[in-house]
Swiss-Prot record:
It comes from Polaromonas naphthalenivorans (strain CJ2). SUPFAM superfamilies: Ribosomal protein L30p/L7e. CDD domains: Ribosomal_L30 (cd01658). GO terms for biological process: translation. GO terms for molecular function: structural constituent of ribosome. Belongs to the universal ribosomal protein uL30 family. This is Large ribosomal subunit protein uL30. PANTHER family: LARGE RIBOSOMAL SUBUNIT PROTEIN UL30M, MITOCHONDRIAL RIBOSOMAL PROTEIN L30. Gene3D superfamilies: Ribosomal protein L30, ferredoxin-like fold domain (3.30.1390.20). NCBIfam families: rpmD_bact. Part of the 50S ribosomal subunit.
Length: 60
């Protein structure tokens, strides 16, 4: 079996005042409040979402 590669993302800045599409991306990654952490599969789609809101999140 192959081991799935995971990536942990932490919301470090509030999405208040950002574009609606960026807030939707934050919700799509499973992040709620500031400092919330979500563990996701490392796929190109997830990487693209992280890149889009890189100023709001930190990869840990």
């Amino acid at each position: 079996m192959t081991k799935e590669i995971k990536v942990k993302v932490q919301l470090v800045r509030s999405p208040i005042g950002t574009q609606e599409s960026h807030r939707a991306t934050v919700r799509g990654l499973g992040l709620r409040g500031v400092n919330s952490v979500s563990e996701l599969q490392d796929t190109p789609a997830v990487r693209g979402m992280i890149n889009k809101i890189s100023y709001l999140v930190k990869v840990i």
